[in-house]
Structure formats: C-alpha cells, structure tokens
C-alpha cells in the first residue's frame, strides 16, 4: 500500500516537472528561429527598419508595388525567416505586387524574444511603416503562412485592409497542439493565436488556402476557419502538405485571386 502511494506521488511529481518544463520552454520549440539568414535582400527589395511599440528596431525586406498593384504584408511561418519568405512570394513579386516581408523579433539579427503579443507588435510596426511610406491600408493584402496566420489575422482585424489571406493557417495554436499531442492540456499553451475567434470580425475579404495532405496544421484547422467565416473564399489544394506556400501552384492561385477578386476594389 505504501509502495503504491509512493509511486503515485512520484508520478505526480514527474508530471508537474514535465508540465513546468513544457510551460517555460515551449517558446523555444514554437519559435526556433533558423540560422540560415540572407546576407542581403535580392534585387528589387531593400532593407527597411520598423519601430515597435515596446521599443524594438526590426529589419524587414520591402519592394514597392508596380502601378495599380496591391502591396502584400507577409508573415512567414515559425520555422522560417526572410529566406523562406522570399521563396513564398516569388509569384506575387513576378506579378508586380509590392511586398513587405516582416521579420520577427528574435529572428535573424533582430532584438527581442518572440511571443504571440510580440508578433502582434511586430506586425503593427510594419503596418505603421507602410502607412508612413504612403501605402494606404486599403491597398494592403495581409497574408500569413502557418503561424504567420496569427499576426496576419490580428493586423487585418485592427486595420481597414484590402484582404486577409491565410495559407496553411491555424484555427488556434492550442488546436494544433491538441491534435499533435493530445496529452498536453490546452491551458499549458501560452501563445494562443486564436484566429477562428477573430475571423468573423475582420471586415476585409478573406481567402483561405490549405493543402489536403498537411499533417502539421491539418485540414481540420481549415474547416474551423471556414466555419468561423462562411463567406471566405477557400482553396483546398490536392496532394499539398505544409510546404504549400512555397509551391508555384499555390502562388499562382494567390496571384489569380488578388488580381481577380480584388481588382475592382479601390
């Protein structure tokens, strides 16, 4: 009896230690900030710097739009950086759209540590920079890939933008964690990125694109986002996984939607 009681106590202590480690260390897993970083922007882009509300000076890549084209404010995934972001916007760049590629705090040479609130501040700083540069919010398409769907949704909620585009978007981070690790209590997930709860309040048109073979952010996330925003345009791409944003096919779909659905919007 005493042995059983001791085993229960030991198991409880192990669970508490594991929970404490998960709670304190999870941002290292959620925001890995890869080391391969572009030394300089490619032709057509230049480095610009934004100023966040909590005092951080962050680098970003920017290229102006051709006449009559939209500017895409782009938020990359958590395991990516500006190198990957450049690969994800080759199609829009070739089509003449302007691009503001946000780099997060703690990524590359940027100061700070990433978090949900931090990424929202980084996005707000990029939006302010565009406005100060003469790009009206109504000319901005806010786009987010994977976890970048979080700051993209938040910025579209706060601003009167042209459109919101979510590629491989999360319905929420606890939803993704629950599917991957059902034993982890939702309450332990510190950063929420609750996009589904916000979509109905976004005034701009919404475009949702997802791969039907995505095993990281599963299509169940798309269904929850679609349920939250029934009037959204939806593209479910057959055979595509979580690398959807980097494919030429996905970028062609995105450019076609922007050039078609948004062409008549002032």
Residue ranges and their predicted role:
Residues 53-132, 150, 156:
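Membrane-embedded segments
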Residues 7-51, 266:
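An N-terminal hydrophobic leader/cap segment in hydrolases
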Residues 248-266:
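Catalytic active-site module of serine/aspartate enzymes centered on a nucleophile-bearing elbow/loop
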Residues 240-250:
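Catalytic histidine-centered segment of alpha/beta-hydrolase-like enzymes
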Residues 88, 195, 204, 218-227, ...:
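Short alpha-helix in the alpha/beta-hydrolase fold that links the catalytic acid
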Residues 212-217, 242-244:
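Acidic catalytic loop of the alpha/beta-hydrolase fold
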Residues 129-133, 137-183, 198:
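Primarily recognizes the serine-hydrolase "nucleophile elbow" in alpha/beta-hydrolase
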Residues 201-203, 208-210, 214:
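Short beta-strand/loop motif that positions the catalytic acidic residue
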């Amino acid at each position: 009896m005493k042995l059983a009681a001791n085993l229960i106590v030991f198991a409880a202590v192990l669970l508490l230690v594991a929970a404490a480690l998960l709670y304190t260390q999870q941002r290292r897993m959620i925001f890995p900030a890869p080391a391969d970083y572009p030394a300089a922007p490619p032709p057509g882009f230049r480095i610009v710097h934004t100023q966040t509300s909590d005092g951080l000076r962050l680098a970003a890549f920017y290229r102006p739009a051709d006449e009559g084209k939209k500017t895409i404010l782009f938020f990359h995934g958590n395991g990516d950086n500006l190198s990957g972001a450049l690969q994800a916007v080759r199609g829009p760049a070739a089509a003449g759209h302007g691009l503001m590629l946000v780099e997060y705090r703690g990524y590359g040479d940027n100061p700070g540590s990433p978090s949900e609130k931090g990424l929202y501040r980084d996005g707000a700083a990029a939006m302010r920079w565009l406005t100060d540069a003469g790009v009206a919010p109504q000319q901005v398409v806010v786009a987010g890939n994977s976890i970048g769907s979080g700051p993209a949704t938040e910025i579209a909620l706060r601003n009167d933008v042209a459109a919101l585009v979510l590629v491989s978007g999360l319905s929420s981070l606890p939803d993704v964690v629950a599917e991957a690790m059902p034993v982890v209590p939702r309450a332990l997930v510190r950063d929420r990125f609750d996009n589904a709860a916000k979509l109905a309040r976004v005034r701009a048109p919404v475009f949702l694109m997802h791969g039907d073979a995505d095993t990281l952010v599963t299509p169940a996330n798309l269904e929850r986002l679609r349920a939250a925003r029934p009037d959204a345009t939806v593209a479910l791409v057959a055979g595509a996984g979580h690398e959807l944003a980097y494919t030429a096919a996905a970028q062609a779909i995105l450019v076609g939607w922007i050039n078609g659905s948004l062409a008549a919007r002032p």
